[in-house]
A protein has these predicted regions:
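Conserved donor-binding/catalytic core segment of Leloir-type glycosyltransferases
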Residues: 194, 241-258, 264
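Conserved small/polar residues in nucleotide/adenosyl-binding loops
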Residues: 267-273
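Short N-terminal targeting/anchoring amphipathic segment
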Residues: 86-106, 122-126, 131
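N-terminal strand-loop element at the rim of the active site
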Residues: 7-13, 24-92
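Membrane-proximal helix-turn-helix segments that form the acceptor-binding/catalytic region
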Residues: 131, 147-192
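Active-site helix-initiating loop/hinge in glycosyltransferases
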Residues: 15, 204, 258-266
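Nucleotide-sugar donor-binding and catalytic loop/hinge architecture
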Residues: 227-247
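Carbohydrate-associated surface elements
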Residues: 199, 219
Length: 277
């Protein structure tokens, strides 16, 4: 099978990219032909398909006010991405497209590529965050509280709650993006949405995606399993030396939305429990 993998970063930036590259490795090991669509970046892995990658867009670093205004429209819809994606499709001719993180740097404009309509190529999307439901990605509002206000598909809640980086302007732009994607029916062009947990699937279903979601836990490659076994065996030895004291293990990026404060807050209930990060 010819499978086109899409992700806005083509280097190991975070968990989504770890999944993306491991998926490519696994698919190739099973004999599938894999191509890539992504964004140009100095840290990118080499790829034959990089000739089709869109130009780099930095919405986080320091850029001039003029540059921010210039790139605001391409954050919502990129004609460059649509054009280059169409050219890649014409060369690779995929049987299926598997999208990962695409918003803002690539945009869902790629789903308007004429090739997809002509050839009815199925599109799969793996949800690595809550961008389909929440302009801020996290379902946490500007006050730091868990929030599901935008499940009603009225995304201007993000403006009144200043949900994006403490900025009303950025919140407005993110809300405009979400409203545009709703009115443009961009998500109707996705055939299947993979949620890595039942909780996320349930939220997606509440938010209007029922009927096209499945819950599927992220996989582990053989090399990741081997590494995990080595780490586990090391900790078993350490635990034996320390008298096997119970502990809570937090595994993830140290940022508030990942929940690091939750185990910190309850470890005092089970002392002498150790928190390992």
């Amino acid at each position: 099978m010819r499978i086109l993998l899409v992700n806005k970063y083509f280097y190991r930036k975070g968990g989504a990219e770890t999944y993306f590259f491991a998926l490519a490795e696994g698919l190739r090991a099973l004999g599938h032909d894999v191509a890539f669509f992504s964004m140009q970046h100095p840290n990118n892995e080499p790829s034959y398909w990089s000739k089709y990658f869109v130009s780099e867009k930095d919405y986080v670093g320091k850029v001039s006010a003029f540059k921010q205004v210039q790139e605001a429209a391409t954050l919502i819809y990129s004609f460059e991405a649509k054009r280059k994606f169409e050219a890649l499709l014409e060369e690779f001719k995929p049987d299926v497209i598997h999208m990962n993180n695409v918003h803002r740097q690539l945009t869902l404009s790629i789903l308007d590529a004429p090739y997809l309509k002509r050839h009815h190529v199925p599109v799969v999307y793996t949800a690595h965050d809550y961008i389909l439901l929440c302009p801020a990605y996290t379902m946490v509002n500007g006050g730091g509280a868990v929030c599901d206000a935008c499940l009603d598909r009225h995304f201007m809640h993000a403006v009144s709650n200043v949900c994006v980086k403490g900025s009303r302007a950025k919140s407005a732009l993110a809300a405009m993006e979400a409203e545009f994607l709703k009115l443009h029916h961009s998500y109707d062009k996705i055939d299947l949405i993979i949620a890595p947990s039942r909780f996320m699937k349930n939220k997606l279903d509440e938010g209007g995606f029922a009927g096209k979601t499945i819950a599927m836990q992220n996989f582990l490659t053989d090399s990741q399993m081997a590494m995990g076994a080595r780490v586990a065996n090391t900790h078993k030895f350490d635990d034996a030396q320390a008298g096997a004291r119970p502990y809570v293990l937090f595994f993830g990026r140290l940022s508030k939305e990942k929940g690091i404060l939750t185990p910190v807050s309850y470890t005092h209930l089970t002392l002498p429990t150790i928190l390992r990060v």
